[in-house]
Structure formats: C-alpha cells, structure tokens
A protein has these predicted regions:
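Acidic, mature catalytic/reactive cores of soluble proteins
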Residues: 1-330
Length: 330
C-alpha cells in the first residue's frame, strides 16, 4: 500500500496461525511455493524525480509515485484487476513465504532514514493517521514501522537456521548482498551515516528498476545461515537507531521525524534553467490548476497553492491541458 504502515499486519497473521499450528512453521514458511508478488501499476520514482525545490526555496519530496506507462501498455495488464509479477515468458512467478518475508524486511531496512531511526515515507503517505499527510513531503519517517521491522527481522533470525537453502529471484539475492556490503563498510567506519543512506537508497532504486516490468526468472540458492547472518547485522543497525531515537526523545521514542535539507544544489539545464520533473508541473505564482479530482483539490489547498497538479502539461497555446506526452512522442 501507499501508506507506510500497510504491511504491519502481515506478522499478525503469521503469529495467529502459528499459535494454533506451531508444528506447521516449516511447511508454512519454507515448503509452500504458491505465493506470488503483486504487480502494482504504481511505481515509486527515484530521488532524482521527486526531490524538488519549492517557490520558497526549500527542498521537498513530491510526486513520489507514478502509474507506469510501459506496464500499462503491456498486453494483458489491467490496472483495475489483480496482476501478478511475471517472467519475460509471461509466466507468473511463484515463491515461498520465506522469500516474501526476506523481500519485505530487506526493502523496509533499505528505507531507514539517514539517522537509522525511522522508516521513510517515500511512497507518499504516512501511517494510519491521515492528519500527518504532509510528512512525506518533509522527508518524513516513522518509528512504529521501525519496531514492526524489528519484529519481522526477529522472526527471520529465530527461524532461518542451518545449511538448507532458500531459493529466491536472483534480483533479490543481489539486493540482499549489495545492502549487506554497504552495511559492512558502515560498520568498519568507511562511510558516514549520510553516505551509507545514499548508497543504500541508490541500491534500492536500482533494484526497483530491475524488477519494474518482470523478474528475469533466474534464481539463486541462499543458505539459511547466511540469511540469518545478514539479518542479524540488520537487527544490530536497527537497535542502534532505536537507541538514538530514545536519546533524542529523552527516554520516550518519538513517533515521527521530519528532515530538512541544509545544503543542496538545484539541477539546471545547459542554459542554466531549472529542470522540472517530467509528468508534474510546478504551478507558477498566481496560476490556478485545472481540477481533475478531489485529491487534486485537497492536495493543492493543503500545500497552500504551492503544489503540483497531476497529469498536466502546458500546451502549445500556453494553457494547461490534461494531455500527457509519452516517451514515444504520442
């Protein structure tokens, strides 16, 4: 889900099931190969497309996800139906709950904020509290999700042991190795908090790009012992972040954080003009948007007129239009 806590309830289901069938853990987690990956039409864009400077000169995070045009154009893909991630031969990829857990925990770990305290709201929505809808634009992160991540990782480290292997998509195995390699550098003092965050965020963005349309179908066998080693290292990093949050809150853990960019450079073209994010137009001062949905109204009013109007471009006559130019020129 777009909301940063939509994944929290998964462990409730696992815990409830195992409270009744504790002897079925191995079958539930490792043996059942009928799980699939939901193939969403929405795509969380990289930082280069969502980090913007508003008219007040402050850096914000807007337009965090888009509907992927290439995916929509794919034969058989229906944005209003349930789609499952496939391999290039158009076969649905099946996997185990173990791999689903690894993927979820890895992706959330890779979304920890620059201080390692909260999970970033980079999907554009906060948690259950909609009154906090402005937080994602302020580089918001939340500690409730950090504790849920700690809970999920504890399940992995408690139950993934031994020389037996877990078969997973090659892209996920690479994602796991790449994040662990940067964490090793961080633990050895080779990179700062900011450099660690930047490198891991880049790895996350590259992973998303690699699986955006398909999984390759290539697989990698990873031992449970190695998985345990990696996630134990992740858990140690999380614990340090929680300690930092407790210290910041004078003994109480803050629920949310916002972040402010104190040093930045605007991206300009060869003529020195600002580069705008494709697909979103910053409204010039004094201009009003064409309202296309209630969400647009709410967002525009909430941002005090300093926001985006989705799916709009400026036409040849200088007026806004709902048309959208695709990469192929149509």
């Amino acid at each position: 889900g777009y909301w940063s806590d939509h994944w929290d309830y998964n462990m409730d289901l696992v815990d409830n099931y195992l409270s009744i069938f504790p002897d079925k853990l191995d079958e539930l987690v490792f043996k059942d190969n009928t799980y699939k990956f939901y193939d969403s039409v929405a795509y969380v864009v990289p930082r280069s497309e969502k980090y913007v400077i508003n008219k007040k000169g402050a850096v914000r995070q807007y337009g965090m996800e888009v509907e992927d045009e290439a995916k929509l154009a794919r034969p058989g893909f229906n944005k209003w139906a349930t789609n499952w991630l496939k391999t290039p031969d158009e076969k649905i990829y099946n996997t185990t709950l173990a791999v689903k857990m690894i993927t979820l925990a890895l992706s959330k770990f890779a979304q920890l904020d620059v201080d390692g305290m909260g999970v970033e709201m980079e999907g554009g929505k906060p948690g259950w509290n909609d009154a906090m809808n402005g937080l994602p634009g302020l580089f918001g992160s939340g500690t409730p999700e950090t504790f849920e991540l700690k809970r999920l990782i504890k399940f992995i480290t408690d139950n993934f042991n031994g020389s037996e292997t877990v078969v997973m998509p090659a892209e996920i195995a690479k994602y796991l190795d790449d994040v662990k390699a940067v964490l090793d550098k961080y633990n050895n003092g080779q990179v700062s908090d900011f450099e660690y965050w930047d490198e891991v965020a880049t790895i996350r963005e590259n992973y998303r790009e690699s699986v955006k349309l398909y999984l390759s179908g290539e697989e990698t066998e990873v031992s449970k012992d190695y998985i345990n080693e990696v996630f134990s290292a992740f858990a140690a990093k999380i614990d340090k972040g929680i300690e930092k949050a407790v210290e910041m809150g004078n003994g109480l853990v803050p629920t949310y954080f916002t972040h402010e960019a104190v040093d930045f450079e605007p991206v300009v073209d060869e003529n020195g003009n600002p580069v705008f994010t494709w697909g979103n137009i910053m409204l010039p001062e004094g201009k009003k948007p064409i309202v296309m949905s209630q969400d647009d109204v709410c967002y525009y009013e909430y941002m005090d007129g300093d926001g985006f109007a989705s799916r709009m471009v400026i036409g040849a006559d200088g007026k806004p239009t709902c048309e959208m130019k695709l990469d192929d020129g149509t």
